[in-house]
């Protein structure tokens, strides 16, 4: 049997709850309308114009004929698994069939998103680029890749990679120690 005072208290609480919910909903709808009406109008802008200068003025390395009619921009992180898959399975064919035939040039842009090893590897590649060995260093970095954030781009390994492509080690080491390309590397993500 139901206790009459309990039923009355329950009915009152239920009624109060329903009234509070209705007022809350009406109030929030009213506030949403106010927010929508008071939002400032923003002039729509198109996308920023991207030109070849966007890619080459910061010293991004170019592979192939600079006057090739097609430009392929490789955005890469030397620790990136999918970047490595691209290098291992597709890039060599693109180079063979399109870059070496003068149809395409490739521009490399650092896109370091994974970790400190990415930045260290990019420094190594830019320092190798001073000796016109960027693409050789790029290739060895991807060939020796062992995973993300596991230390494969340690100073010792990066030095061994530079030695293996016959870089002038005094110049390369001086460049690395000076972190000469830090700004270019960090700005590449913008």
Which ranges hold each PLM region?
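Extracytoplasmic thiol/disulfide redox context detector
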Residues: 1-113, 183-190
């Amino acid at each position: 049997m139901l206790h009459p005072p309990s039923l009355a208290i329950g009915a009152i609480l239920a009624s109060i709850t329903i009234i509070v919910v209705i007022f809350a909903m009406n109030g929030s709808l009213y506030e949403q309308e106010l927010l929508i009406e008071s939002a400032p109008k923003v002039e729509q802008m198109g996308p920023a114009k991207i030109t070849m200068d966007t890619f080459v003025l910061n010293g991004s390395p170019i592979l192939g004929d600079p006057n090739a009619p097609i430009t392929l921009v490789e955005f890469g992180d030397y620790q990136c698994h999918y970047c490595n898959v691209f290098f291992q399975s597709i890039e060599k064919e693109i180079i063979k069939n399109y870059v070496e035939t003068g149809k395409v040039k490739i521009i490399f842009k650092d896109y370091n998103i994974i970790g400190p090893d990415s930045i260290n590897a990019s420094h190594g590649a830019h320092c190798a680029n001073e000796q016109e060995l960027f693409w050789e260093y790029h290739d060895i970095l991807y060939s020796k890749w062992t995973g993300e954030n596991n230390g494969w781009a340690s100073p010792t390994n990066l030095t061994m990679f530079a030695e293996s492509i016959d870089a002038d080690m005094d110049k390369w080491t001086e460049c690395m120690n000076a972190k000469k390309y830090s700004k270019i590397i960090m700005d590449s993500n913008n």
